[in-house]
């Protein structure tokens, strides 16, 4: 699966949310998304959950790094993050 396809899947599942970043990690593209028109200045820090697209099954899921390999995910965040 290519990133563009994962972006389309996320936009279809969460059409009103804005994409902030994506991490290419293992079998997932892990997205950070926020509600529309969200600004830190107006609402403060956003602590919403991460949403991932499984590259193999092309399905979305809530992603919790601690349920995977936290050290490997942290390394992926350092090296494989793209911001929108």
Question: Residue spans of the language-model regions?
Answer:
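Extended interaction regions within the primary functional domain
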Residues: 34-36, 48, 63, 77
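Residue-level detector of alpha-helical hydrophobic segments embedded in or interacting with membranes
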Residues: 10, 30-31, 65
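A short, surface-exposed beta-strand/turn
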Residues: 41-63
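Short, non-transmembrane alpha-helical segments in secretory-pathway proteins
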Residues: 1-20
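Intrinsically disordered, low-complexity segments enriched in small/polar residues
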Residues: 12-15, 23-26, 71, 81
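Charged low-complexity stretches with an acidic bias
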Residues: 57-84
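Alpha-helix capping and helix-coil boundary motifs
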Residues: 2-5, 39, 68
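Amphipathic, interaction-prone secondary-structure segments
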Residues: 19-46
